[in-house]
Amino acid sequence: MVRLTVDLVMKNSNVLRNRKDESLARHLRRITHLNFSNKNIDEVEDLTMCRNLTVLYLYDNNINQIKNLGSNLTHLYLQNNCISCIENLSGLKRLEKLYLGGNCLTVVEGLEGLRELRELHIENQRLPPGEKLLFDPRTLHFLGISLSVLNISNNNIDELKDLAVLENLTQFVAADNQLKEIKDLEFVLSKWTKLCRMDLSGNPVCLKPKYREKVTIISKTLEILDGKEIKEMARQFLLNWKASRISKKKKNLENMTGPSLLPQLYESDNYRSLLPVYNQNFRHQLLEQPKYIVMAHTQSCNKHGQLQRSAGKRNISVIEDIKSEARGMESFSGCIPESECVGGQHGNERPGYPTNLINLWKGEKDETEGIP
């Protein structure tokens, strides 16, 4: 057992006394850096006399509790010890870098007072089998103000949504975890608008088709992904390619629905609300088929409820397929312009729906039969 005491500091300090009669307190105040790595230290005694100590190396020891540290520390290295709880750090108001990798932490907590903390390294925790590293929401909230570098590699982490509050991150390392979903990345990357470097190597998500291309498009600021540089020319190519695909889909959709409803259908995040309201089972089945086929039919209705010839047999055959599902439907509300519909005050049908389409859903004779 080795304790880090003031006497041990004096013996190992590189700062020499100016005079033989220099007091101990004065000498300790002149020490700014201490390196006691790999010294079999298991306990730290009071170092508050080292008032100007800013950098302390205590990695590769047997320390199991964080305590008795100087209040002016800016860099603290505690990797590869036996620490199971983050505690007694609230007084370190100037701490900028904290290294806690290779310990026994299960929860990241107790960092609420560290408003100057820029880097947090907590990789490779010795976790119980089947458990993952957790994050205290209160700690994350406070870290979101200042933290720019976070390393959480090899901690069985399977989602990142709780980390979205860390909006000032510029470097993020989460290699060798259990991240699987691109959507999870998409959410946090939309919040991390300052991110320049990210390493997710060794995660299942890296095996997803077009993983690198998708991440490159999602994050406009990312410069290095999994150790490889992202060329701006490559990102621009992917963005242009995506825009081209969207434009092509938009044109295809316009051909199916007609131009009047296209902006609502295509730009809405909740296109389902723009579709007619069917009974639940029928609505589900319709969404499994081409989503706008009924809209294509209704858009083709003129003021008299007659189907224009441009609709063609394609729409008729589709409606024949869904006729049996539509019978008995009690409610239907759609996004059909009034100028294209009949009924309401001038007829017996429900307002805002083309006559021939309502008759078709009721199982009556299809007025569109015979149209080439």
From Swiss-Prot:
SUPFAM superfamilies reported in the protein's UniProt record: L domain-like
Gene Ontology MF annotations: actin binding; dynein complex binding; tubulin binding
Pfam families reported for this sequence: LRR_4
InterPro entries: Leu-rich_rpt, Leu-rich_rpt_4, LRR_dom_sf, SDS22/Internalin_LRR
GO cellular component: centrosome; cytoplasm; manchette; microtubule cytoskeleton; microtubule organizing center
Annotated LRR repeat ranges: 30-51, 52-71, 72-93, 94-115, 116-137, 146-167, 168-189
Annotated localization: Cytoplasm, Cytoskeleton; Cytoplasm, Cytoskeleton, Microtubule organizing center, Centrosome
Keywords: Cytoplasm, Cytoskeleton, Leucine-rich repeat, Repeat
Annotated LRRCT domain residues: 203-241
Job of this protein: May regulate phosphatase activity of protein phosphatase 1 (PP1) complexes.
Name by which UniProt lists this protein: Protein phosphatase 1 regulatory subunit 42
Source species: Xenopus laevis (African clawed frog)
Record lineage: Eukaryota, Metazoa, Chordata, Craniata, Vertebrata
